[in-house]
Amino acid sequence: KVLYLDCDVIVNGSLCELWNTDISDYAVAGVRDRINDYIRVYNRLGYPMSEGYINSGMMLINLKKWREDDFFKKAQQLACEKGASVLKNHDQDIINAIYHEQILMLPFRYNLLEYYLYVEEWLYLDRKYYPEIIDACNNPAIIHFCMPQKPWHYECINPFKELYYKYRKMTPWPEVVLTHKMQKLSRKQKIKGLLGKLGLYHIESKPTLRREVNVIEELNNVLF
């Protein structure tokens, strides 16, 4: 097996327990992505939502299984068959589509996606995951800077960005100048951004969703 990590992560704790996880009966182990409960994802990829959807930024991979399955060939075939319009998340979609029945879900702390640091993002997940996400935020083993604003950008507001500065000082490039990430938006990008905000009005107009927001605001007080 092999532990795969994206380049925009910081290891913040021991990975021994993670490495010792038995995945002999699975093709891959990973952490649920924030779009785990998006029905559209499963409609697009063609498998049941009950099987879940992982983020590919941290994966414990069963190499024996992948080799036996000739995964690379399957991935090529799927990419050619479905195309970018279906496989919007590229390799992540491909891995989930091929191995959705053979995924072991791991605790959120092993891939703390930056989205989970902002409780409004929790609206996209089932409430049953909230306690585990709180634990992950307080005790992350792997911190994933998965949003467009990385720690080396001025716009980054991730509370863990100081860890990046800490470790950067230990590298041969301790004085790298930060850069601005935000670029001038096109008209299309502005329209997409405005459309995204319509979801807030939808929440306000639905009592059930409004209650969910209130719960999240209470959790925010506990966390931060």
Language-model features: locations:
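GT-A fold catalytic core of metal-dependent nucleotide-sugar glycosyltransferases
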Residues: 1-38, 60-61
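Extracellular/periplasmic catalytic domains that process cell-envelope and extracellular macromolecules
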Residues: 22-23, 51-53, 134-137
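Small-molecule pocket liners
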Residues: 26-27, 56-57, 141
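A short, conserved beta-to-alpha structural element at the edge of catalytic cores
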Residues: 28-48, 157-160, 172-173
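Short, P/G- and charge-enriched loop/turn segments at secondary-structure junctions
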Residues: 43-49, 127-132
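A recurrent flexible, glycine/aromatic-enriched loop bordering the glycosyltransferase active site
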Residues: 48-58
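Short glycine- and hydrophobic/aromatic-rich loop-to-beta-strand nucleating segment
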Residues: 57-66
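A glycosyltransferase accessory/donor-loop signature
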Residues: 66-224
